[in-house]
């Protein structure tokens, strides 16, 4: 089947994910003394970080493709009957836009937390994105549990939520020397799930489940028609005998 433009644009989520992975992987080489085991990813894009220029180059496609992808997903699911699933996707889209605009407008002023207005706003944006992330993923998980058509993406949402919780709890539990390790569970959860949504759209907008339902419905209808034809034939034979 020929892919529509909407389907093809679903791949923007994968491009966004790869751009983010490249930025997280290679930006530390431009930041002397950066310890990925202990430091947060946001330190790489701090206003005074020596890696800022490289980060901006490598992540150039990250925010653009991420917001474009989640917007495409919203369009793709807008006609779906499952209101709960649509709500979850819309909440996730709000989170992505808040994240893209908020973190670009308020990067950390320096590595760590300097308690400036910019840093406070960065933390506020983080709090909002976390709230919307958790809420959206829970809604999608529930939608997947109730409707088998969305069970696959519901499992992906459960994995993403688990990663977020591991990151959030891990940052409170593990020693400071390993803060960066658990923090990366959280930061990769959202962009990874965004890529998963985009891939679903690319491979038919969850149509594999929809088609399965259509095939089942078609078979049922064919059985009904066949049964009706048999009954009509039997009735006709009875009429002939009686006449």
Where are these regions (language model features)?
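Hydrophobic, aromatic-enriched alpha-helical segments typical of multi-pass transmembrane helices
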Residues: 4-33, 39-40, 44, 48-203
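Long hydrophobic alpha-helical segments typical of transmembrane helices together
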Residues: 179-227, 234-243
């Amino acid at each position: 089947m020929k892919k529509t433009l909407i389907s093809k644009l679903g791949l923007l989520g994968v491009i966004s994910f790869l751009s983010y992975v490249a930025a997280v992987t290679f930006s530390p080489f431009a930041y002397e003394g950066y310890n990925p085991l202990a430091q947060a990813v946001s330190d790489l894009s701090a206003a005074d970080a020596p890696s800022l220029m490289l980060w901006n180059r490598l992540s150039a496609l990250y925010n653009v493709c991420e917001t474009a992808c989640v917007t495409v997903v919203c369009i793709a699911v807008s006609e779906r009957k499952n209101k709960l699933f649509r709500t979850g996707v819309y909440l996730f889209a709000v989170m992505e836009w808040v994240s893209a605009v908020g973190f670009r407008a308020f990067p950390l002023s320096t590595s760590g937390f300097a308690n400036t207005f910019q840093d406070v706003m960065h933390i506020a944006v983080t709090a909002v994105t976390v709230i919307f992330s958790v809420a959206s993923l829970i809604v999608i998980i529930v939608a997947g549990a109730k409707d088998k058509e969305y069970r696959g993406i519901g499992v992906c949402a459960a994995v993403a939520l688990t990663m977020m919780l591991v990151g959030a709890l891990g940052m409170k539990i593990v020693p400071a020397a390993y803060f960066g390790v658990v923090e990366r569970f959280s930061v990769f959860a959202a962009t990874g799930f965004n890529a998963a949504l985009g891939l679903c759209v690319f491979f038919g907008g969850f149509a594999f489940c929809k088609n399965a339902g259509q095939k089942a419905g078609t078979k049922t209808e064919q059985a009904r028609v066949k049964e009706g034809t048999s009954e009509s034939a039997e009735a006709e034979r009875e009429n002939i005998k009686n006449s």
